């Protein structure tokens, strides 16, 4: 979440003219941006900060999880982790049987053995063609580990290997 105060506008190089074009969004809403009739943006509530986006444009669907993830941690008590799971499942269930061409979702090694729970739940619900893991803290080996641990599950989504910051991908969706 970024507040559009003078300090942050200056920090991020946002002019007053540009700020007038920014629309602040809320969870669980549908947005139809001005001057277009072929893009629809739906938001989901994050389990941390902000929202996740489901964007439909010209027959294609892109999902960006943001911080919507199954944030289960070793240092938290069972009640916290169970509550987090319930909140996450409530949101991610909105993607049941949704065809998603391109998805971006957290795969966070800080969660230790639970690092892949969020993507597992996402993949069990949505029909995803390509999935880009994110939030992996410059530890791209976690992507290969995730894929190897799930070799027997015959995932229908192609999990994209990311090897370095700034890497360029060409994907035909």
Could you describe each region identified by the protein language model?
Residues 1-2, 63-67, 83, 102-109, ...:
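Active-site neighborhood of phospho(di)ester-bond hydrolases with catalytic His/Asp-centered motifs
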Residues 2-7, 29-31, 49-51, 70-74, ...:
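Active-site environment of divalent metal-dependent phosphoester hydrolases
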Residues 11-12, 44-47, 67-68, 104-109, ...:
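Noncatalytic linker/hinge segments flanking ATPase motor cores
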Residues 21-99, 166-173:
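Core dinuclear metal-dependent hydrolase active-site scaffold
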Residues 87-93, 112-121:
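A short, acidic, amphipathic alpha-helical segment used as a generic capping/interface helix at domain edges
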């Amino acid at each position: 979440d970024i507040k559009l105060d003078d300090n942050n506008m200056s920090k991020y190089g946002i002019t007053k003219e540009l700020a007038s074009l920014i629309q602040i969004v809320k969870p669980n809403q549908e947005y139809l941006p001005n001057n277009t009739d072929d893009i629809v943006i739906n938001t989901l509530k994050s389990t941390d900060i902000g929202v996740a986006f489901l964007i439909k444009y010209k027959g294609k669907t892109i999902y960006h999880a943001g911080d919507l993830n199954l944030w289960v941690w070793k240092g938290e008590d069972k009640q916290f982790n169970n509550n987090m799971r319930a909140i996450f499942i409530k949101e991610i269930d909105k993607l049941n049987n949704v065809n998603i061409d391109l998805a971006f979702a957290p795969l966070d090694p800080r969660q230790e053995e639970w690092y892949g729970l969020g993507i597992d739940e996402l993949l069990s619900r949505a029909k995803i063609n390509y999935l880009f893991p994110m939030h992996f803290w410059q530890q791209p080996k976690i992507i290969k580990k995730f894929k190897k641990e799930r070799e027997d599950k015959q995932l229908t989504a192609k999990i994209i290997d990311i090897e370095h910051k700034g890497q360029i991908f060409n994907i035909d969706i």
